[in-house]
Design a protein with these regions (language model features):
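Short, charged surface segments at domain edges that flank catalytic/cofactor-binding sites
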Residues: 1-22, 81-90, 94-97
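A detector for short metal-coordination/catalytic motifs
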Residues: 50, 61-100
Length: 100
């Protein structure tokens, strides 16, 4: 990923992981979270504060570059819960770090 596409700092990544407390998609334990772009890089997304969530390796591999809501429905995960938390957490992060 080019530098211009990776604006996420280590402090921001730590805050994101802490805010979610586990996999943003399935809720799995927070022990080995990976960065996932809600809007995939292949769809114009970037590794930025407002687009990255912590995910377990299984969800990360499964979602790949799929559109997040379509993927959540296909996996029968709670789309509404994810979207509500995503908005809430991004508001909190914006207050802490500036606009997301």
């Amino acid at each position: 990923v080019a530098t211009a596409d990776n604006d996420l700092t280590l402090a921001q990544w730590g805050a994101i992981k802490q805010a979610w407390g586990g996999c943003a998609y399935c809720g799995a334990d927070a022990s080995s979270m990976q960065k996932d772009c809600v809007q995939a890089i292949s769809r114009g997304g970037r590794y930025t504060l407002g687009n990255v969530v912590p995910v377990c390796p299984s969800c990360n591999a499964s979602k790949c570059n799929a559109e997040v809501t379509t993927w959540l429905r296909r996996k029968r995960l709670d789309e509404r819960r994810f979207l509500e938390r995503f908005v809430e957490i991004n508001r909190e992060l914006a207050d802490r770090f500036g606009d997301v």
